[in-house]
Amino acid sequence: MAEITASMVKELRELTGLGMMECKKALVEADGDMKAAEDLLRIRSGAKASKAAGRIAAEGVISGFVTADGKQGALVEVNCETDFVAKNEDFINFAGNLARLMADKNISDTALLEDMSIAEGETVESVRKALVMKLGENISIRRGISYQTKDHLAMYLHGSRIGVMIDYAGGDEALGKDLAMHIAASKPVCVSSDQVPADALERERQIFTAQAAESGKPANIIEKMVEGRIAKYLAEVTLLGQPFVKDPDQTIEKLLKTKSAKVSGFTLYIVGEGIEKKSDDFAAEVMAQVTQSK
């Protein structure tokens, strides 16, 4: 029997939004397997798929850059330990210079940046180390992506915590900005349903089938229920299937058709996405719940 720790229960609660005891019971039944425990809870509760990748647990900034002609651009995430440092001007400028460098050199592998010149006589790594010494926190270049296109790039930064880069053809600059803002707000996983990973789709199908089976309805009805839920799931996670945030009566797919436009791809970065850091207050949270139950 695997040991079920408080941090495991906390993580499952964040994934599902369900109660502490429900999560602990599911983890025990799943012998500590987080994914299996989540599936158990979803089958029982009818909950939607978690957005595990959206758990925010690190500090830092998203920075981006697009050339004036809209043909080259880059997004980068630089992490630190506290929001205080994330607001530091030198830290913010470092991230901005990285985005420009990545766009200029068309680099998406951040490991290749270390020895590149970012300032007169200084490399990326030397500037990073100097910031660590000055600010007293670990600073890491977590990820980045560069774009070169024959069409158009649009970028949207929501403060410094969310960044979107989109590659599109047709329409105008206003459309590009609207699409980028929509992605930041609605957080699609991919452009179209054929890009949804097969294993993710199969997992949803199995869970929907198990949920529908509990209704006790005939097999043919269950099959229709499952297909309906799959269609809804695909509409939720794909850009083309989502209702446009500025006009929910039309989908992004319909919007693009009216503008004779097409989206080739996009990148969405959220600061700390998928990173977990040690939490010191979970014990206090548990004690508070115990006290309330007395």
From Swiss-Prot:
Annotated stretches, region: Involved in Mg(2+) ion dislocation from EF-Tu: 82-85
Keyword Protein biosynthesis in record: yes
Signal peptide stretch: none
GO MF assignments: translation elongation factor activity
Domain of life: Bacteria
Keywords, sorted A to Z: Cytoplasm, Elongation factor, Protein biosynthesis
Keyword Hydrolase attributed: no
Compartments, record wording: Cytoplasm
Record CDD domains: UBA_EF-Ts (cd14275)
Pfam family, any one: EF_TS
InterPro entries associated with the record: EF-Ts_dimer_sf (IPR036402), Transl_elong_EFTs/EF1B (IPR001816), Transl_elong_EFTs/EF1B_dimer (IPR014039), Transl_elong_Ts_CS (IPR018101), UBA-like_sf (IPR009060)
CC terms in the record's Gene Ontology section: cytoplasm
Disulfides per UniProt: none
Membrane-spanning segments: none
Family per similarity comment: Belongs to the EF-Ts family.
Function: Associates with the EF-Tu.GDP complex and induces the exchange of GDP to GTP. It remains bound to the aminoacyl-tRNA.EF-Tu.GTP complex up to the GTP hydrolysis stage on the ribosome.
HAMAP family, A to Z: EF_Ts
Annotated protein name in UniProt: Elongation factor Ts
UniProt lineage: Bacteria, Pseudomonadati, Pseudomonadota, Betaproteobacteria, Nitrosomonadales
Encoding gene, per UniProt annotation: tsf
